Amino acid sequence: MKKFLEAISTYIALANQRAEHHVGYCGDEQEEILHTISHEFSDLPVGESIAVKHENDAIIGVLGADVDLGDGTAELWGPFVKEGQPAELALELWEDLTTRLGDKVHTYYGFYNQQNTLARDFMNRLGACKGSSHLIMHAFKQKGVRINSRVDELSPERHASFIKLHDEAFPDTYMSGLDILKRLDHEHKVFTVESEAGIKGYVYVAGRPNHNEGTIEFIAVDPAERHQGIGTTLTKAALAFLHDELGIQTVSMTVDAGHDQAIRLYGRAGFEVVHRMEHYTVRVTY
């Protein structure tokens, strides 16, 4: 199994480094991908969650599903199809994968680079519903970025205020305010700007220094407290923590492509656009 996973992670890493094969749910570093599929990938065994096609003992196609059994959904890793292979190979991988998963999964999500035409055609042939467009933005380590004195780490007495702000700002997201609180540790933190009445704004950051990976997962400012520079202050605080305290060189975040004001805010804080992405949903019935 170890050699099998190493071969798959190498194949995915090489493919995902190219925009025309890029899938947003997985990275492009072999060691990080290997760690994820070995320890964090899917609620089901890897053998059930990844379909692979070979030709002359060489991998020519991979499609994985990061399954959440709790809600019957999965994020698609792929399809990754070797150049020169027919597009129908992606459909063969799909049939293989969905046959294994059966009724354990009813909804699949795809998140693909706009230049990934194979994935776009694949989604269209499956009758997927196209969702919103997103930007993946990166910020690289800068000198002199410090955490503003207005910013504090979330304290226990502000937990209720944080949950209220987060759940109102992101009512339908994948992680509730309570979920975030359960994850907090030395690599996952919430920073806030507060008043006596409660939290004006917050940012939730997640770092994986062993893989040089850091993300700004959520950021929100109370609507009554906007236009005070709080968003920029929080973004810079997040970068200072991830860059300086965890030693992460590149920080990423995903932004709705239609949120021009947010994109400008992140640009002022040091982020730049690196990928333009499309989101898809495939619902299956049995």
Give names to the regions the model predicted:
Residues 85-99, 125, 221, 227-241, ...:
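Conserved acetyl-CoA-binding loop-helix of GNAT-fold acetyltransferases
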Residues 114-132, 232, 257-275:
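Conserved active-site alpha-helix within GNAT-family acetyltransferase domains
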